[in-house]
Design a protein with these regions (language model features):
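A short coil-to-beta-strand element that immediately follows conserved catalytic motifs
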Residues: 87-96
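Non-heme Fe(II)/2-oxoglutarate
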Residues: 1-86
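Short hydrophobic alpha-helical module
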Residues: 84-88, 122-123
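Conserved active-site beta-strand element of glycosyltransferases/polysaccharide synthases
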Residues: 99
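Catalytic core of non-heme Fe(II) oxygenases with the double-stranded beta-helix
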Residues: 102-126
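Conserved hydrophobic/aromatic beta-strand scaffold that supports enzyme active sites
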Residues: 9-11, 96, 118-122
Length: 126
C-alpha cells in the first residue's frame, strides 16, 4: 500500500541535492539580509510585495516571503519527486518560505484550502 495514502504524510530524504539545498538556503539568507538593509535605509517599504516581511502572525519577527521566484522554481523541480512518492497528480499552487531562527515555533495549523497537500523542505540551518 502507498505509504502516503496510509499515513497521510511521508518523509522523503534527499528530495533535492545537498548542493541545491545549500544554494537555496544561502540565497534566502542573503535575500533576508538585503531586504532588512533596504527597509532600514528606506529603499523599499515594508509593504512592497516580493521583498518579504517580519510580520507573519504565525511566527512573529521571523523573515518570510510569499511566492519567491527561486522558491517557485524549486517547487517545480521537486514536483516530480512528490508525485512519484505520493502516486498523485499534483497541482502546484504557491510557495511560502521562512528563515526560522533559534526559539521560533510554528504551531500546528491548517493551511488554506488550495493547499490540500503540503511539502516542507529543510534547506539548512546554523
Amino acid at each position: 500500500m502507498n505509504m502516503f495514502k496510509k499515513h497521510k504524510y511521508l518523509i522523503i530524504r534527499n528530495a533535492i541535492s545537498f548542493e541545491l539545498a545549500n544554494f537555496a538556503f544561502n540565497y534566502f539568507l542573503m535575500k533576508r539580509d538585503a531586504t532588512e538593509w533596504m527597509h532600514k535605509n528606506n529603499y523599499v517599504s515594508e509593504f512592497t510585495p516580493g521583498f518579504g516581511t517580519w510580520k507573519d502572525q504565525q511566527v512573529p519577527n521571523t523573515y518570510s516571503v510569499y511566492g519567491d521566484t527561486f522558491m517557485e522554481t524549486l517547487m517545480m523541480k521537486v514536483l516530480p519527486v512528490m508525485e512519484k512518492h505520493t502516486e498523485l497528480k499534483l497541482l502546484p499552487t504557491y510557495t511560502y518560505t521562512r528563515a526560522y531562527k533559534k526559539g521560533d515555533v510554528l504551531k500546528r495549523h491548517k493551511d488554506r484550502p488550495s493547499c490540500q497537500i503540503s511539502t516542507t523542505v529543510h534547506l539548512g540551518g546554523k
